[in-house]
């Protein structure tokens, strides 16, 4: 019998000075050629498990480990990351902290050089991995000119260039647009199916990858809560933790339909078998309570929080200066909640940085009369202390920490928090105005849902709605269409530096091929959230009457 790629026996781990273990008596086997999806709430231990599988736990982080952990036949307690590096590749939540070379080519060549590969072997490996990840055009770019999504693909390429037996990915689609995210999952599936590479990825956006997985392991408080097939996971999540359910499965559950689907294709097939025809392009009557603007005073309606007029921004990308933003005309008023969307490199982050006066336009103007606070893609950029409580001191700071669920973390180092926890701390800092010297008229956030589970996203949406209700405009650059559908009162879509769509979420997120929610893709329009989709399906079920054997509950 072949030895598993990874074998954990009663494996536990506690970080230095932590009161509770991060991993508790894990009993797991990861087989050769499996594609495993790690699910679970933020801070549940998913990232720690990945770090253990590549040897960073305990060799880099320290702390106490017990039990047995073997990866590719090596005892991880005796063999660290250097010895596992050629066998196990790792892509972290924040790729900007993983990329160390000044150019993309140098980043990909570095692991090959360290292994002593010849120039010919390096050239071939670079050609293959850059083609696979569609980054050939980036090879000679300085890494500090890349967008977050481009950095994500470069970090993955560097992890794959040695062709490891096992690849570990922590939130790999978190900074990728829907197109690039689908391409990445397709690539991982191809590597898994055609080359037998083991894949373990931790994700919160399960709708992107559940259909590609062979197996789902859900982790909660450092222990395995579920281990089984994607189909069984959907049924388990619906009963045990609906926050983990992907949107399509959640819609089916709310409508009383079974079985719960693991993909858009499976959902459409089930609806056809049940004889439920949903008319594509039906007007979307839903507008979630959270998405309704409440701050509507006459004077405030006429005022402006953020305004761009014929905005042009240039950037040196390493291959010459190019226009990153062109002819942008945009007015955002107090109380609006705007989702700024578009492909990687479309100009979303540049627009937010221009609003915060971090870069200057070459033509036109962008104004924020009452100032603009910015949460950057890397939340760690805002941390200046070694203690969470010192980032937001005093009673007001403690209230801000409590609002993001971090009141118990006041004594921890911000850099030791999980990715989702760091994001929440940064949001508290920005919303409190600490990053801009006071309360601003516009609060801008760049990919704030990275590392967050469904429950935390809903909490974030509620907090941002409260900020907007108090009179500040909230602008969120995001690839998370599901979050945008429930949070935003308006969606602005950028394409290659230009504004190409601007309207209600129901208009923008239902009609497109890629910037559409899972519910919209299943139904062909008519609804964009699980709640709205379930209402539409229940209406169709009632129209069909007693001839349809569906239990409405």
Q: Which residues fall in each region the model found?
A:
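Catalytic Walker B motif of ABC-type/P-loop ATPase nucleotide-binding domains
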Residues: 167-170, 443-446
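ABC ATPase NBD Q-loop/coupling interface
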Residues: 68-83, 359-375, 379
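ABC ATPase nucleotide-binding domains
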Residues: 235-302, 515-553
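H-loop/switch region of ABC-family ATPase nucleotide-binding domains
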Residues: 203-204, 478-479
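ABC ATPase C-loop
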Residues: 159-160, 431, 436-437
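Conserved ABC ATPase signature
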Residues: 142-146, 150, 413-417, 421
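Conserved ABC ATPase "signature" region
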Residues: 120-138, 397-409, 431-432
